[in-house]
A protein has these predicted regions:
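Asp-box/BNR beta-propeller blade signature and adjacent active/binding-site loops
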Residues: 1-354
Length: 354
């Protein structure tokens, strides 16, 4: 059933969700890793994790990475492909790999690899330094991985603007930032991802924060968002008007239905935010919530697609522009398939503004 949300930025249409990865039938799970990238018009790669259903009841990144191709703007998908690097790391027994974000710049695809520890039950934190790998042949083959940053942490978002790749890392080997040295850093590449250099430390009070998203607004400014973990109804952000060299923290945003694992995108004449919400009867990190905004800083009261499920709805999005069609946002996310566990399938839905 299609849902319609009368948001502040317009009438947001939310399509009926479609099953993308049927982990239930193969008795697997799919924690983290929802990267998507369009490398040519209409030609998309979508990544997902193939994880143990038993370790931490399916909420552990104990597994490897798969990906599929679409040649028709995300309508149909190829058979599963294995990201060999992730399998090699898995069987080596030290790291597992999560692919949270991917970009394409001038025909070169860059994947950002989070290196999780296999030595803890969640197979996630503590993180090692992040790596990246590339494809020069539309995802058929991949280069050997390179280190993105000397800081242990997790790359939460990456975008491309004017032939520059921007990647944002939360530099902390554990989930929640607790120390002054735990900061959000911006790394940039001007050579299609061959090399990256640190551009700045984002001017954001990172203590008690985690997750994050990047957004270039219509006025050219760059916004970094960070989740306030103790208060699931607050979201902090910092704005740069010089492509990430300097920053100004803006007033804290108060979100009626909360936000965790924030994802923000430009769509049509407005902006969309989605992630896990905060429900007064269940707590933070539950449900799947969508907001709209006219400026990327002031958000409406939001819409719950689902209110109470926990430890799922990790998500990502990809803007798709098909000729003769309105702009659409493809959203990939995890959805609980078995009560009493944290085992998830992976689903797709589409967003568009009337």
């Amino acid at each position: 059933m299609e849902r319609i949300f009368e948001g502040v930025a317009g009438k947001l249409r939310i399509s009926e969700p479609e099953l993308f990865v049927d982990n239930e039938s193969r008795r697997r799970s799919g924690h983290m890793s929802h990267a998507m990238v369009e490398y040519e018009p209409g030609r998309i790669i979508a990544f997902n994790s193939n994880c143990s259903p038993d370790r931490l009841l399916g909420h552990a990144a104990h597994g490897w990475i798969e990906y599929r191709f679409s040649d028709d703007y995300g309508k149909t998908w190829s058979e599963i492909n294995l990201l060999q690097y992730s399998w090699d790391e898995f069987i080596n027994g030290v790291h597992t790999i999560s692919i949270e974000k991917a970009v394409c710049c001038n025909g070169v695809i860059t994947l950002f690899a989070v290196r999780n520890s296999q030595y803890v039950p969640i197979c996630c934190e503590p993180w090692d330094t992040p790596y990246y790998l590339q494809s020069y042949d539309n995802g058929k083959t991949w280069t050997e991985p390179k280190e993105l940053s000397p800081y242990k942490g997790r790359v939460y978002d990456a975008v491309v603007k004017d032939n520059v790749i921007y990647a944002m890392e939360v530099c902390n080997d554990n989930f929640i930032c607790k120390e002054p040295e735990h900061v959000y850093r911006l790394f940039c590449s001007t050579d299609n991802g061959k090399t990256f250099e640190e551009r700045s430390v984002v001017g954001l009070n990172a203590v008690d924060h985690a997750y994050g998203s990047l957004l270039f607004r219509d006025d050219g400014s760059l916004v970094v968002y960070g989740d306030n973990i103790p208060n699931g109804f607050e979201l902090d952000a910092s704005v740069s008007r010089d492509n990430g060299y300097t920053w100004e923290q803006v007033p804290t945003m108060h979100l009626a239905k909360g936000m965790r694992n924030v994802q923000v995108a430009k769509l049509g004449n407005g902006y969309v935010m989605h992630g896990r919400g905060s429900h007064p009867d269940v707590g933070s990190g539950c449900g799947f919530v969508f907001y709209t905004s006219k400026d990327g800083l002031n958000w409406d009261d939001g819409y719950y697609l689902e209110e109470t499920k926990k430890l799922c709805y990790y998500s990502n999005n990809l803007l798709v522009r098909e000729p003769g069609q309105p702009e659409k946002l493809l959203v990939q996310y995890s959805d609980l398939y078995q009560e009493g566990t944290w085992r998830v399938n992976v689903k797709h839905l589409w967003l568009s503004f009337d």
